[in-house]
Amino acid sequence: MIEIYGTDNCVFCDKAKNLLRMYEKEYTYIDVTETEDMTAAFFKKFPGVRTVPQLALSDGHHIGGYTELKKWLNHSE
């Protein structure tokens, strides 16, 4: 399962969701601005990262942003 960490009105978050649907990959979307705790958890999980989307596997492996997701999907086929 892939976790997408993003925000509302994030074009690349929507692109990531569409790309995962195209590859028929299951994902969970987490809006990091929903609560202050979720925002804090995002910065703790991805130290030094200030952009969304950020994608990770449920085992904790950090894929990266949208560009890294495309590369990861191409290599996982």
Located regions from the model:
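Local sequence-structure signature of Cys/Sec-based thiol-disulfide redox active-site neighborhoods
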Residues: 1-25
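Thioredoxin-like thiol-disulfide oxidoreductase module
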Residues: 32-49, 75-76
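Conserved beta-strand scaffold positions in the cores of enzyme catalytic domains, especially
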Residues: 27-29, 62
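Residues that form or flank phosphate/diphosphate-binding pockets in enzymes
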Residues: 11-14, 37, 64
